[in-house]
């Protein structure tokens, strides 16, 4: 009888132990969820797949090393439809339904402006990986891509000094990024003694640039500086400009390698500055490109200055979580500015008012749509983006 009681007691203790351990094991296996609201449809649909691919490679690399704090990394792409209404839906879905630990993504400025307050209210860290017009600030918002202070002066100076552009036409998409970048360009042009002959803006969803191109032809500038939204609008504008026979030097504040390549020869000759190009010659970039080719093969979307930063963002977040010993949001935002990720662009640290000093390069689109790096300007500071931080 005692033997039976002993066995029953042993079974009861074993069951209790299993029940006690089960929640711990479940907690250990709970994934770290990274939401990626991005323009899978709309104007950003040209570049969005490359953003997702960068995230997937980073997640694979992290999971191969045991994940984040021993938990698997799960990326959740969400279509923000390249605009504010879609961003509101995507951010709410990512935070409420998918229980995102962090949001890491590239978006239009309109989408970011709609989504960022949702992340801020929910106290979810948001690493914004897109170049943008600057001055977006929040306790939970971090930016690892360029702002106007880093790319506009080098581009305008090059075109002024070496392409002899003094009289300019300025063209932009009619939203925060387009107008913000053109404002920065106008200031730099005037500071360098140049003249703005005309300034025109196109509604974001409109693809016919005929009226604006007619005004450029009438103004007869030495050169053009433009800033559309990322992706397709660049190609629409440049194709129509080429068809109109306008051949003056062009500087872009919105194009990227993937978009230029997708446009065939439409962007041939266009100059642009940025913090990432596939032609950057360093070991980490070579390793990154090889890993991307190995993972995606024929499906690979050319890594570019709107997608590579996603890869950096995931790794920086992982480093912050490991350093903090937790994925708790308040702990993460304290540690995030202190981590330095050595990646394809070089050393990146979001320690300047939640923005990052970045290496900046000058490049030009070739006849086949490929981009050639022409010059390395070195590390450039983002300036005062959020002075109260």
Predicted region positions:
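Extracytosolic ligand-binding ectodomains
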Residues: 2-389
């Amino acid at each position: 009888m005692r033997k039976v009681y002993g066995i029953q007691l042993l079974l009861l203790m074993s069951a209790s132990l299993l029940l006690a351990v089960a929640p711990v094991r479940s907690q250990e296996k709970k994934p770290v969820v990274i939401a990626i609201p991005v323009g899978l449809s709309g104007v950003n649909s040209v570049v969005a797949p490359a953003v997702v691919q960068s995230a997937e490679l980073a997640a694979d690399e992290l999971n191969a090393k045991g994940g984040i704090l021993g938990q698997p990394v799960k990326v959740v792409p969400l279509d923000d439809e390249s605009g504010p209404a879609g961003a509101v839906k995507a951010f709410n879905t990512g935070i409420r339904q998918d229980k995102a630990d962090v949001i890491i993504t590239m978006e239009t400025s309109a989408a970011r402006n709609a989504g960022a307050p949702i992340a801020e209210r929910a106290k979810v860290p948001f690493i914004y990986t897109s170049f943008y017009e600057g001055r977006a600030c929040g306790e939970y918002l971090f930016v690892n891509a360029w702002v106007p202070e880093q790319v506009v002066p080098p581009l305008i100076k090059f075109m002024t000094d070496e392409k002899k552009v003094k009289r300019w036409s300025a063209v932009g998409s009619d939203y925060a990024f387009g107008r913000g970048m053109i404002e920065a360009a106008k200031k730099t042009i005037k500071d360098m003694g140049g003249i703005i002959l005309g300034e025109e803006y196109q509604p974001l969803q409109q693809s016919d640039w005929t009226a604006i191109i007619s005004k450029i032809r009438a103004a007869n500038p030495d050169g053009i500086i433009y800033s559309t939204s990322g992706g397709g609008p660049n190609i629409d504008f440049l194709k129509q400009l080429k068809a109109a026979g306008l051949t003056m030097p062009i500087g872009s504040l919105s194009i990227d390698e993937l978009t230029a390549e997708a446009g065939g020869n439409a962007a041939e000759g266009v100059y642009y500055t940025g913090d990432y190009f596939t032609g950057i010659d360093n070991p980490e970039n070579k390793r990154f490109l090889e890993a991307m080719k190995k993972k995606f093969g024929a499906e690979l979307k050319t890594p570019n200055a709107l997608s590579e930063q996603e890869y950096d963002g995931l790794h920086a977040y992982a480093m912050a979580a490991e350093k903090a010993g937790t994925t708790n949001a308040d702990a993460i935002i304290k540690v995030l500015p202190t981590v330095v990720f050595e990646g394809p662009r070089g050393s990146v640290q979001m320690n300047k008012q939640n923005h990052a000093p970045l290496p900046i390069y000058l490049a030009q689109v070739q006849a086949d749509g490929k981009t050639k790096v022409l010059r390395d300007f070195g590390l450039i500071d983002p300036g005062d983006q959020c002075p109260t931080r």
